[in-house]
């Protein structure tokens, strides 16, 4: 009976979506790699927002395979979506140029938030803002939420996203998004697989047909918050278009226990299929 139960819940060995301090995660790359090892993972993809800066440090940790990745901020049908680049070459000049362009806009947006929040009576300490800029290549809204929390303007991080940041969103410059076609192209030029991250629930078969025509390689079919029905739908689309399916925790910090490494991920067979597609 135990063997039968084990067969129903095969071991998760790979997490192909996680963030470090190189973008908006709480763990340094090496600390995250150690955390993944402690979670009994064999493989971890470092997929920071719009940067590959954390990959090299993570690779210094022995005993775990690190997949070089990135999560690009992408424009599709006038909306922002996210695309994972997995098994990329972190030294690829084209990929770095795209990341650098988005990084500059992210830093500009951080300063926009600082100014807008000060204008409504919520100043953020300059030394702490400068610290974020020094540590993170690609600062994001999570950093702003942390700064608001540290300054005592909110009691918990979630308040920032629900109550505070929407008030100033219209006064903050946006990110410099890359078109999804260009994002897929640059990931391919960097030797990687282009995977749609946490696909929006409203995407239908026609939209996935468009993405197939753009040479998308796969979808993240298992992630935090996705329903079994949606996972089944994504797997159907993957079968129809010859895509791979990936899964990951989307880890940012230990404060979200449902998003820690080892909680959501891939079995050995599932990971092997993706690695084969990537030529690994």
Residue ranges and their predicted role:
Residues 1-80, 163-170, 181-240, 244-256, ...:
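An N-terminally biased module of ancient metal coordination in phosphate/nucleic-acid-related enzymes
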Residues 2-5, 61-212, 268-271, 275:
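Extended substrate/RNA-proximal surfaces in nucleic-acid metabolism proteins
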Residues 216, 257-280:
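His/Asp/Glu-enriched, well-ordered alpha-helical/loop segment
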């Amino acid at each position: 009976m135990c063997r039968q139960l084990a067969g129903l819940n095969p071991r998760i060995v790979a997490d192909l979506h996680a963030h470090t301090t190189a973008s908006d995660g709480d763990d340094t790359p090496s600390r995250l790699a150690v955390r993944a090892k402690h979670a009994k993972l064999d493989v971890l993809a470092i997929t920071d927002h719009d940067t590959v800066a954390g990959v090299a440090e993570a690779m210094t940790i022995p005993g775990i395979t690190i997949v070089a990745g990135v999560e690009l901020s992408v424009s599709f049908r006038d909306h922002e979506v996210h695309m994972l680049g997995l098994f990329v070459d972190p030294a690829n000049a084209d990929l770095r140029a795209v990341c650098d362009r988005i990084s500059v806009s992210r830093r500009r947006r951080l300063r926009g938030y600082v100014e807008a929040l000060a204008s409504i009576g919520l100043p953020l300490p300059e030394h702490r803002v400068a610290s974020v800029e020094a540590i993170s290549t690609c600062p994001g809204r999570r950093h702003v939420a942390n700064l608001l929390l540290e300054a005592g303007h909110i009691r918990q991080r979630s308040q920032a996203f629900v109550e505070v940041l929407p008030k100033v969103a219209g006064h903050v410059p946006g990110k410099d998004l890359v078109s999804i076609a260009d994002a897929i192209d640059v990931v391919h030029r960097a030797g990687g697989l282009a995977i749609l991250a946490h696909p929006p629930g409203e995407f239908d078969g026609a939209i996935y047909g468009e993405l197939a025509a753009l040479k998308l390689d796969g979808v993240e079919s298992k992630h935090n918050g996705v329903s079994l029905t949606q996972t089944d739908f994504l797997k159907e689309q993957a079968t129809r278009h010859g895509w791979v399916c990936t899964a990951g925790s989307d880890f940012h910090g230990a404060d979200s226990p449902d998003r820690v490494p080892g909680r959501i991920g891939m079995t050995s067979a599932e990971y092997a299929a993706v690695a084969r597609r990537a030529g690994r």
